[in-house]
Each structure stands twice: as structure tokens, then as C-alpha cells.
Amino acid sequence: MSLSDQVLAVNDDLPIRTDKPVHSGKVRSVYWLTEEDSRRLIKEKGYNVAPDAPLAIMVISDRISAFDCIWRGEGDLKGIPGKGAALNAISNHWFQLFKDNGLADSHILDIPHPFVWIVQKAKPVMIEAICRQYITGSMWRAYTQGEREFCGITLPERLEKDEQLAELLLTPSTKGILKGIDGVPEVDDVNITRKNIEDNYDKFNFSCVEDIATYEKLLKEGFAVIAKALTKIDQIFVDTKFEFGYVEDAQGNEKLIYMDEVGTPDSSRIWDTKAYRSGHIIENSKEGFRQFLLNHFPDPDILLNKNRMEERFALAKENALPLEAMMDLSKTYLDIAAKITGAPITLSDNPKAEIIKVLKEEYQLVD
């Protein structure tokens, strides 16, 4: 079995029964179930949702996205072996820990396969809920260029690279392109202030202005739960991105929940504690791959400058990355997943065939 066979690169062509277009994102694809299948599964499986709640099958891939591009490796390797299963396993672990600690629910109702979630359709809050405990990455790059205000928060002078901040900073950005909001540029992923959100809470999809405080509380609590757990395995939770949305429970009550993934190497930076204390950074996240790309290409500005997107897309399309770099990243994902969950990630020989089999035989979602 070749590496390419073990990688799930294309995840939007599964024969899952649906009457709507498949939504294909950078890493995950979403298959909206028919009303009949949603009602049937809710009844058969006893999901704690309204009887008419729309459900979806969310399938993760092994594709690797960085700097808004999808990258590939030598030998026609179109993803990172084990990446999808590792990300899902980590998210599953944190969502369970959130539940154990009395935090909000997630959109996940069932886990038929390591690559697959059955989820309840949520109304997304249009915010990338980012929080930072250390100054690094894009914030550090902006700081070195003289910026001191981030999302309405003023940072002090004389901070050093990778330094722990005095408090957890909430630095939200827009999710997608939002139009007609005063003071918010109509571009994707632009930083916003709390006042931006308060003044336009409905345009960010909050049901009421009070829910802004609820989302901030859930963000801080979720960060704290993960940070505490990572400390026990000698890892530092540096920064992360959460996403939130609204669903209705079985009684028809609206509630704010966590959605997408949480605390993964894709959505977070995770550092090795011992290395950090000795003055070194060992990245146990996708950030190491980003740094590899910046060092690999002679003109890293292409990867950082949003005015050079066409060049960036061409760079990703025309360059197969060294196999060693792809496998190093695979090891990063598999190792940190095993540390966090306490169990090794088993690579599937043919993930697509396995997914089809379980959805056909156990969920009757494949004709």
C-alpha cells in the first residue's frame, strides 16, 4: 500500500445521499443529509436535537493548507499521512473534556469513522475567535514594524519575540467577507474590535448583544481547559482559533456552541515546554510547516504579502515539496495527537473505502 493510497486528498466525491451541493472547504467537505435521512438518524440514534434538525456528514481530508494555499509533495503525495485522523482525534478529545468541565456542547453528534463527524447544522457566528497567550507569528511581525494596537488592545513597549503576555488577549477577526459594517473593511479575515462587534452584533450573527460576553467566556474557558491539560504533557498552548454557532436542542431552545475544530495543530500553536524554557521553540503544530515554507522559497514575501496572491497560488501549484518535509509534518501531527489523546493514531490503508462501508452498512446513507 503506497503513501498516496493512505492519504485522503479528495473528500467531496463520496456517494453519500444528499439533495444539496457538497460544500468543499480547504480541509473538510460537508454533505447535507436529506430531511428524511436527518429525521431517521435522529430517531434511530437518539441524538439530543429537535426531530426536524438538519444534519450533515462532515468528512475531513489529509490536505495541507498554509498561507491560503493547498500544498503537495513529491511522488504525487497530495496530503499529509495521518493528518485528518489526528486532527479529528484531538478535537474529539477536547470537546469531551469541555463537556466534562461543564462547558458548552459542540456541533458533533456522532463519530462513525476517524475521518467523519455527523454534525447538527449551526448558524455560525461570523467571527474567528482568536486568543493569544504569547506574542509570536503575525502579531510579532506587526509589532516589529511598529504596530502597538491590536483589535482595540494596546500592547506595551519592549516586548520580546515569543514572550508570554501579561494576560490572554482576545484578537478576533472576521469570518468571511462581511459587508456594510462601519469601520470593518470588506475583506476576509480582518481584525476587529469588541466595539465593532457590540455595535453590529446582529451582522456578526449574534442573537443578542449579551451573547458577546458568553462567547468570550466560552473562549477563555476553553483555552484554560486545553492549556491546563497540555501543561501536564509538557506542552504550551500558545494561541488558538475557535469558532462558535447557534443550534436548537431537542426542546427547541437556542444555545451557543463550539463548532469546527478546537485545540488542533492546524488551529493553534503548541510549543514544547522544556525547549521553551531553554530558549528554543519546538513547534508541535502547523506553524513549523509555515516556517519551512518561508525558508524553502527564495522570496518569502510572496507567502506573506496579500497583494501577491496570484504568485502565491502559482507557487503552490507548480512546486512539489520534498517528501521529507511532508513526512516530518506527518510525524508532528501523529506524535502530538498521541500525546494529547493517550492513544496512537492508526493509519487507514484505504480511508475512502472504509468511510463508504461504514456509512452504507451502519447508517444507510449510501445507496
From Swiss-Prot:
Stated EC number for the protein is: 6.3.2.6
The GO annotation for biological process reads: 'de novo' IMP biosynthetic process
Keywords of the record, alphabetical order, are:
ATP-binding, Ligase, Nucleotide-binding, Purine biosynthesis
| Pathway info | Purine metabolism; IMP biosynthesis via de novo pathway; 5-amino-1-(5-phospho-D-ribosyl)imidazole-4-carboxamide from 5-amino-1-(5-phospho-D-ribosyl)imidazole-4-carboxylate: step 1/2
A GO CC term? cytoplasm
Protein's UniProt keywords contain Cytoplasm: no
* Alphabetical list of InterPro entries matching this protein: SAICAR_synt/ADE2_N, SAICAR_synthase_Vibrio-typ
Q: Which GO terms describe its molecular function?
A: ATP binding; phosphoribosylaminoimidazolesuccinocarboxamide synthase activity
Can the keyword Cytoplasm be found in this entry's annotation? no
Q: Which reaction does it catalyse?
A: 5-amino-1-(5-phospho-D-ribosyl)imidazole-4-carboxylate + L-aspartate + ATP = (2S)-2-[5-amino-1-(5-phospho-beta-D-ribosyl)imidazole-4-carboxamido]succinate + ADP + phosphate + 2 H(+)
Domain of life of the organism encoding this protein: Bacteria
Q: Which Pfam families match?
A: SAICAR_synt (PF01259)
| Top-level EC class as recorded in UniProt | ligase
Q: Which PANTHER family match?
A: PHOSPHORIBOSYLAMINOIMIDAZOLE-SUCCINOCARBOXAMIDE SYNTHASE
Spell out the family assignment given in the record's similarity comment.
Belongs to the SAICAR synthetase family.
Q: What is this protein called?
A: Phosphoribosylaminoimidazole-succinocarboxamide synthase
Which species does this protein come from? Aliivibrio fischeri (strain MJ11)
